[in-house]
From Swiss-Prot:
The gene is nikR. Coiled coil: none annotated. The lineage of its organism: Bacteria, Pseudomonadati, Pseudomonadota, Gammaproteobacteria, Enterobacterales. GO terms for biological process: response to nickel cation. This is Nickel-responsive regulator. Ni(2+) binds at H76, H87, H89, C95. GO terms for molecular function: DNA-binding transcription factor activity; nickel cation binding; sequence-specific DNA binding. Keywords: DNA-binding, Metal-binding, Nickel, Repressor, Transcription, Transcription regulation.
Length: 132
């Protein structure tokens, strides 16, 4: 490991310390390492890491005109990527779906884009983990 020095303004340092306390980190370095890992996982995978896993989560209005049917059709069109899907009724109007995906990361990104772009889908998020 290498030692580095960071300069942070007071508000950002206070936020880091509060996060560290909430999550039970023993020191700031552990918190910064996890924050960096998370940020790096948010970037699209590099071309050399073409396969991997991903979690796609999104909320949608199940009564929106034919949205549920369109989402199911999209999932079936990309059936080879799907490992598992969890469906949760979070209110009378809204459903939360969480899909675990595996495969070519460009295809995974395309699938996520198709789902998130549907009218009535909110809070779409794709978390990627490329194979090492």
């Amino acid at each position: 490991m290498q030692r580095v020095t960071l300069t942070l303004d007071d508000d950002l340092l206070a936020a880091l310390d509060a996060l560290s306390a909430r999550r039970g980190y023993h020191n700031r370095s552990e918190a910064v390492r996890d924050i960096l890992r998370d940020a790096l996982n948010q970037d699209p995978p590099s071309p050399e890491s073409r396969r991997g896993y991903a979690v796609l989560s999104y909320v949608y209005e199940h009564e929106k005109r034919e949205l549920a049917s369109r989402l199911v059709a999209t999932q079936h069109h990309h059936h080879d990527l799907s490992v598992a899907t969890l469906h949760v009724h979070i209110s009378h109007e809204d459903c939360l779906e969480i899909a675990v995906l595996k495969g070519d990361m460009a295809e995974v990104q395309h699938f996520a884009d198709d789902v998130i772009a549907q009218r009535g889908v909110r809070h779409g998020h794709l978390q990627c983990l490329a194979d090492d």
